[in-house]
A protein has these predicted regions:
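C-terminal and inter-domain tail/linker signature
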Residues: 1-359
Length: 359
């Protein structure tokens, strides 16, 4: 991938973020139009899903959020760009800007922070600081953003506001830090060979999981030896999972607090591919729409099983340290996955708050 193209795409996304974050309420649509294609498309977590057109994105997502969370500021921890091989990914998404091997994707990860002063999605405000985990992807074509995908941890927002839609989680809950090395904002050029190393390592890790899934289908053995993980992960790895699962530290605790509940309590797993998977320097990322389809057999998230297959839209951001992965930030659109099984966490919250009736 041409470094000039990567840097130009980064500059476009940074310019957009700066202008949009400082735009007045009346200027948000004009700023979005300035930096994006006319047929701009947007993907978001439940309950927003896929939106087309600038007005829809502003009126359905951004304006309600910014009205509810006063003084909203963006606090990025990771920023990278890269091209991608179409062979790695799912079929072309519903976009009027067709995919190309020359496209550049830009990823930014961090927290939105502000004061939760008004209801959002009927989540009651607590009038205190709110930290919203986010990962945002932009596909840049001809120096304009053709499509975006924004994932936030909605269940974390609910829990910070005193709403608890899920049983106690297996991992820890806190405001997750950025990279231990504090070098995740890749504004300048980085040697292409380092990004290649990172992507190859991520691909090898994904391939190991695919083989484990196939073995489980053939033998019903969902266990994965820690020695298998240790070929691609440092022993003191950190996994920052979504609220409802939580964060975990070291390979041993990762297996017991996330991997085994995930592997043993979810069946019929089908990998659907990734929309984008790329790396730059020591950092890499991907997201799918959905990445994975599975069926809850009982126990995952502390919930009962279901006979209904459900889709997981998953974001992963990685940091490589040497020849192994050291940190992994993950957002899963769990509310969407749950809604496909008949549990709408926002509807249930509204019912409990007396804002919506059961019939």
């Amino acid at each position: 991938m041409n470094q000039q193209n990567l840097q130009a795409a980064k500059h476009r996304v940074l310019a957009y973020c700066d202008a949009f974050d400082h735009a007045s309420e009346s200027d948000m649509i004009s700023v979005l139009r300035l930096h994006t294609h006319d047929e701009y498309s947007w993907r978001g977590m439940y309950p927003f899903h896929e939106l087309s057109g600038h007005e829809s994105v502003i009126e359905l997502f951004w304006r309600p959020l910014k009205s509810a969370v006063s003084h909203l500021q963006r606090r990025p921890d990771v920023f990278l760009a890269g091209g991608h091989s179409l062979a790695l990914h799912a079929p072309e998404p519903n976009s009027k800007q067709p995919l190309s091997d020359d496209d550049v994707w830009v990823c930014q990860m961090g927290h939105f922070m502000g004061l939760f002063d008004r209801p959002w999605l009927d989540i009651p405000p607590h009038h205190r600081m709110l930290s919203i985990r986010y990962v945002e992807f932009h596909r840049v074509v001809d120096d304009r953003i053709a499509e975006s995908a924004l994932f936030i941890d909605l269940i974390s927002v609910m829990r910070q506001a005193g709403q608890n839609p899920l049983p106690p989680q297996t991992g820890a809950s806190f405001v997750y830090p950025g990279p231990r090395t504090h070098d995740g904002l890749l504004f300048s050029e980085h040697p292409e060979c380092e990004g290649v190393k990172t992507l190859q390592l991520i691909n090898r890790m994904v391939a190991d999981l695919s083989r484990a899934n196939q073995h489980a289908l053939e033998t019903s053995d969902n266990a994965v030896p820690v020695s298998t993980l240790a070929t691609t992960w440092h022993e003191d790895m950190i996994w920052y999972g979504p609220e409802g699962i939580g964060a975990t530290y070291t390979l041993e605790r990762y297996q017991h607090q996330h991997q085994y509940p995930f592997r043993f309590n979810l069946g019929s797993k089908t990998f659907n591919g990734h929309v984008a998977r790329f790396a730059e320097g020591n950092y890499g990322c991907f997201f799918g729409w959905p990445n994975l389809t599975n069926t809850a057999t009982g126990g995952f998230l502390g919930l009962t099983g279901s006979t209904l297959p459900a889709d997981m839209r998953i974001v992963d951001v990685y940091r490589r340290d040497g020849d192994k992965l050291a940190e992994n930030w993950v957002i899963i659109d769990l509310p969407h996955w749950l809604s496909m099984q008949g549990l709408d966490v926002l509807v249930r919250m509204r019912q409990l708050l007396g804002k919506e009736t059961f019939v």
